[in-house]
Design a protein with these regions (language model features):
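Gram-negative bacterial Sec-dependent N-terminal signal peptides
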Residues: 1-25
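Active-site histidine-anchored catalytic micro-motif
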Residues: 19, 25-174
Length: 174
């Protein structure tokens, strides 16, 4: 009889632990990460090479390289493009703008993080400022070193970008 009580008690604790985790996740802000490519998603043949291919990694690969991101927010990712930002054009900008506006209109989404190449990051940011009207934050991040570099800066930039998106002080600023 005692053994059944212990097993039932353990099952109850496990179930409660699972419930607590679900409640904690529900309390976290929801952030949508839209990926466009760029150096932040770049890959090189060797970590010591200087040349690389922009946009080689998809959004899920980028997000999985960021430790503890799940402690900041409930993250979902979507691939918009896989290009170097020097190849950004009207078609990609319009696709991105439409998607940003659609995501910002979702009641359960608290903000957007965009991963982008640095060549045209500021042009994209300015364009999005002109075509979005939500008070929810839209943050853009890029990197100087590809994802496969010895000291890739993308994971830290993504982490810090999500931290900005989830900060209440970021609302109403773009």
């Amino acid at each position: 009889m005692k053994r059944k009580q212990i097993i039932l008690g353990a099952a109850t604790l496990i179930a409660m632990g699972g419930f607590a985790t679900a409640v904690q996740a529900a309390d976290l802000p929801a952030v949508k990460v839209l990926a466009t490519g760029g150096t932040i998603a770049g890959a090189q043949a060797s970590a010591t090479d200087y040349g690389y291919k922009s946009g080689a990694y998809d959004v899920n690969s980028l997000l999985s390289a960021v430790p503890n991101l799940d402690k900041l927010a409930v993250i979902t990712g979507e691939q918009i493009a896989s290009i170097g930002s020097q190849d950004m054009n009207d078609e990609v900008w319009l696709k991105l703008a439409k998607r940003v506006n659609a995501v910002l209109a979702e009641p359960g989404t608290d903000g957007v993080l965009i991963t982008h190449g640095t060549d045209t990051l500021e042009e994209t940011g300015y364009f999005l400022t002109l075509v979005t009207s939500s008070t929810k934050p839209v943050v853009m991040v890029g990197s100087m070193r590809p994802a496969t570099a010895i000291s890739a800066d993308g994971p830290g930039n993504i982490y810090n970008g999500v931290a900005v998106v989830t900060n209440p002080g970021a609302k109403g600023k773009g």
